[in-house]
Amino acid sequence: MAAQCVTKVELNVSCNNLLDADVTSKSDPLCVLFLNTSGHQWYEVERTERIKNSLNPKFSKTFVIDYYFEVVQKLKFGIYDIDNKTIELSDDDFLGECEVTLGQIVSSKKLTRPLVLKNGKPAGKGSITISAEEIKDNRVVLFEMEARKLDNKDLFGKSDPYLEFHKQTSDGHWLMVHRTEVIKNNLNPMWKPFKISLNSLCYGDMDKTIKVECYDYDNDGSHDLIGTFQTTMTKLKEASRSSPVEYECINEKKRQKKKSYKNSGVISVKHCEITVECTFLDYIMGGCQLNFTVGVDFTGSNGDPSSPDSLHYISPNGVNEYLTAIWSVGLVIQDYDADKMFPAFGFGAQVPPQWQVSHEFPMNFNPSNPYCNGIQGIVEAYRTCLPQIRLYGPTNFSPIINHVARFAAAATQQQTASQYFVLLIITDGVITDLDETRQAIVNAAKLPMSIIIVGVGGADFSAMEFLDGDGGSLRAPSGEVAIRDIVQFVPFRQFQNAPKEALAQCVLAEIPQQVVGYFNTYKLLPPKNPAVK
């Protein structure tokens, strides 16, 4: 029997007194959460943001986990000093880790442990604190904020201000829950609109005190406090564009030193609105279908399928990396598609009878009906197709992305959150049409669509990591920025010794938030939502 999710738990992470791995400055730490479902293999679930030049980081990005009462959920929090832009952690300095169960965290509510090395021995210094909160509320607060006449903290140029929001815990401590972007060189900044869950902001209590701090960002990590104010949601929600709610930004040290001190600037809340966001399960249970499409790389670099060295070689027990990826992801996602008919395409091969190179040919060779019956149908189409084509090239992604995008665009005519499209591309190597693919992804980001790329074999996948917008927004050659991150890339080699479900859990981890993010952005409700009627 499948485990029933009792509730969702939000984990907030901070560290103290970390090892200093950088010679000329302090470490730039981030926290990686790993999960263990099988007993031996750990797989990565999510990462916090990287905090520059800090040995005592407080991460604003939280981890949200389904809490299962009847399952021992093993978690590992790894702390790394990040000095480059690659996704791999092997080339970053490891500062220590902490293994713990979710049950231990929730029963403690706040757990502090010393960091240990991979061999289990103490890291020498550094501790991690994990705070747990149950998420009971899907209300979010939308903010528009600006400031004027902020103090200038910089000798050359002007301050680079950003805001931090803090809520007060039951024991009186302040916990940071949101950090805005930095506005460079500006004493009258206008921050981008942002949202914070009401639970994160004030536990859903409209009269709970909220502290807002304004800082001047410094590259060396020694951010200067410009000033602070305290308020409540009751006061904040009075704000409107015609009548903003304004707060004096007060620096207590300056006020005590200077009798004539008035303030360090004024922070203006132009808009503060509470709205309810549907959850992923609200959409799924409300009738949203996930449409799954597979794209398989049949380029020559895979090697002759009849040779055991080929990535397309099917072993005597009937598997290869392509088939494993199809099974792993497909078995999870098929439950969210009512008819279980999945289109499957190949690209980069010469196809009969003309032997022209195609980058979106149906693996069942039926252009009018490229659908396969279930995941088994995709596997059978792949096996049947392989001996009938000639592996060729180049490795072009954009045709198949644009193909699925056309269906996603048609679905937007329905005005409800009725369909979402997930494209799985399995590839062995370096992408050829990078500019066209970047443009295709930027276009697809405006549609109900996500792209999963699984890299098989041992090739250099740096271009794929570039498409996965985790390090910042992807741009089209035109300069247009993707409005959301829709690409998830993982190299298959990370999962070669993992249980079969680990790959799917990793690549599908971001899908729920991408689904919710899209439908919330366009204010689309589930088809069966009572509010629609």
Curated annotation (Swiss-Prot):
Any GO molecular function: protein serine/threonine kinase activity
Location (main, coarse): nucleus
Q: Which residues form the C2 domain?
A: 1-115, 124-247
GO biological process terms, semicolon-separated: cellular response to calcium ion; cellular response to growth factor stimulus; ERBB2 signaling pathway; positive regulation of cell migration
Phosphoserine occurs at S14, S197, S243
Q: Which family does it belong to?
A: Belongs to the copine family.
Q: How does it assemble?
A: Monomer. Interacts with ERBB2 (preferentially with the tyrosine phosphorylated form); this interaction occurs at the cell membrane and is increased in a growth factor heregulin-dependent manner. Interacts with SHC1; this interaction may mediate the binding of CPNE3 with ERBB2. Interacts with RACK1.
Write the protein's name: Copine-3
